[in-house]
Amino acid sequence: GKLIKENNLITLDVGGTTAKCSLIENGNVKINTNYWIEKNRQSAGYPVMLPVVDIVEIGNGGGSIAWVDNYDKLHVGPQSAGADPGPVSYGKGGTSITTTDANLITNRINQNYFCGGEIKADMDAVSKTIEPLSKKLKFTNEETARGIIRIANNNMINALKLVSVNKGYDPRDFSLVAFGGGGGMHATSLAKELNIPKVIIPVNSSVFSAWGMLMSDLRRDYILTKLTTMNDQAIDILNKT
């Protein structure tokens, strides 16, 4: 943020499996000491009582799979096709329509210059694979693809609200920095929905997280656990510790 003179930022990293977002206020990254790992609907998770960057992560990325439930409701994620076999358009045997495939159908991704021209998008396979979903929803393939993108966007909007609106921050006071392989595909739609005035796409955004890790300052946090009885003397004991 300092390099581009932007002190208030909402960051969004959209990869193949997940989307991660965080908030920077006045140049300061938000830190959380109440972080849980492996927390999901089936597990209460495990607390990591260490300072970490306050990140919200959801199962929504370029490889997130679109599916229809028993009530004919369309969903996107959290299941992912991963990188192998990956989206159907990769032509590597993928059998489930993903957000990337939907972006290709709607021409949000150039079908003739897929992955910088390194991969020939298998659009015949994409059309055949999305057809059952479209028939179940009674949509055209393009309508189904647009629905997939809208649901993916809504999932990410909810995540962005968790780091901003839900914590008392107005997104209109921030700029959105989007990176990762899919960040640029969805950033403007998300910013429009949240009234974020500026979208920033870094150079080499697909590897921006890795670059940031290499460029970030080293930091060490020293923590000491002290077990003591909660009584009138506890505060003095903790202060001495």
Spans of features found by a protein language model:
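N-terminally biased helix-coil "hinge/interface" segments that flank
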Residues: G1-T241
